[in-house]
């Protein structure tokens, strides 16, 4: 199955990366990870390790964390848009797997105070 091209702004064709299910999984896991990363700055027992997110937090405060997450999502969508099918599906699938690991680790850390990955 190929991606459906949709006419975009000024005649630019939009070619969303991956399948609809993969994109939904990406945005759900991305959202969970974004909330968890934001909570890392308000709980005393968890630390955000991503230096870009930490820098955005230092510059903009708590709103900087979702802003950093939005930048990450934008980068993933842009890269997926540039890749051809089926490589775009593989790329977004790999990102979904990474976010699955990150989100699971972060949620367990927030709920139990201990990281299952030992990070």
What are these regions (language model features)?
Residues 2-119:
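Hydrophobic alpha-helical segments at protein termini of multi-pass membrane proteins
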């Amino acid at each position: 199955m190929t991606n459906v091209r949709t006419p975009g702004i000024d005649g630019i064709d939009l070619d969303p990366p991956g399948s609809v299910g993969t994109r939904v999984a990406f945005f759900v896991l991305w959202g969970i990870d974004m909330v968890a990363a934001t909570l890392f700055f308000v709980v005393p027992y968890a630390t955000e390790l991503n230096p870009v997110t930490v820098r955005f937090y230092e510059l903009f405060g708590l709103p900087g964390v979702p802003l950093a997450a939005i930048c990450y999502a934008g980068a993933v969508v842009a890269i997926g848009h540039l890749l051809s099918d089926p490589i775009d599906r593989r790329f977004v699938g790999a990102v979904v797997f990474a976010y699955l690991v990150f989100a699971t680790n972060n949620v367990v850390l927030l709920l139990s105070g201990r990281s299952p990955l030992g990070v």
